Amino acid sequence: MDLLSKTRRINRMLQKSAGHAVNFNEMSQVLSDVIEANTYVVSRKGKLLGFAIHQEMDNSRMRKMLEDRRFPEEYSMGLLKVDETSANLDVDSPYTIFPVEMKEVFRTGWTTLVPIMGGGDRLGTLILGRINDQFVDDDLILAEVGATVVGMEILRERSEAIEEEARSKAVVQMAIGSLSYSELEAVEHIFEELEGKEGLLVASKIADRVGITRSVIVNALRKLESAGVIESRSLGMKGTFIKVLNEKLLPELEKLKTS
């Protein structure tokens, strides 16, 4: 496969991921295939977002890091000091991706680091590792294109998370806004009773204790459920099981208490 074909394959990752959840393991696999190297996508805080192995390294510490999906803090912080592509670092480099306790085994292990940038911010690092053959210019071009694509996907994922949070908050505010004063009072007592995100509620007990009718509680729950904020299920004489579906509900209720 020539350089142009490999570049097109990397760029197709963007088209494929449009409208879908970002899969950094799949992206790592594509980069690993076209560059023929072990590939790791690491966030700025050291979280391993995705990886693909081209050449196996039999090392328990590396296996543990891959299982935990996290690199050591000291190593991760060190990566942030690398602000441009650094190619063909040997096993004596503090940035080597090969296990330092096996230096003699991986004497011909080469590491390349490519900063992942987006929106003017450092988002993470693309790490490539290869045994025997050094990385050449074509590999570095592909790595930098790959890092750009990964950066765009990280930004898209962040943007979607922010949008989802705003949507969740708006839904909760609308649901709370639809409640009457007595229904809102009932809701506050309901979640004080639950002491968490889910639990069993006996409406008649709350109604008697607070001095409101049972129908007010039922109406309040119905409004929240129709908004998709909670889920409720009648358990007959035992009461009603309630589960919070929107994580913004409890903080918003807490805010109302203190305002």
From Swiss-Prot:
Its main location: cytoplasm. It is found in: Cytoplasm. InterPro entries: CodY, GAF-like_dom_sf, GTP_trans_reg_CodY_C, Transc_reg_CodY_N, WH-like_DNA-bd_sf, WH_DNA-bd_sf. Coiled coil: none annotated. Residues 203-222 bind DNA. Keywords: Cytoplasm, DNA-binding, Repressor, Transcription, Transcription regulation. One of its GO terms (biological process) is negative regulation of DNA-templated transcription. The keyword Cell membrane does not apply. Gene3D superfamilies: 3.30.450.40, Winged helix-like DNA-binding domain superfamily/Winged helix DNA-binding domain. The keyword Ubl conjugation does not apply. One of its GO terms (molecular function) is DNA-binding transcription factor activity. Pfam families: CodY, HTH_CodY. One of its GO terms (cellular component) is cytoplasm. Residues 1-155 are annotated as: GAF domain. DNA-binding global transcriptional regulator which is involved in the adaptive response to starvation and acts by directly or indirectly controlling the expression of numerous genes in response to nutrient availability. During rapid exponential growth, CodY is highly active and represses genes whose products allow adaptation to nutrient depletion. NCBIfam families: codY_Gpos (TIGR02787), PRK04158.1 (NF003170). Belongs to the CodY family. This is Global transcriptional regulator CodY. It comes from Brevibacillus brevis (strain 47 / JCM 6285 / NBRC 100599). The lineage of its organism: Bacteria, Bacillati, Bacillota, Bacilli, Bacillales. The gene is codY.
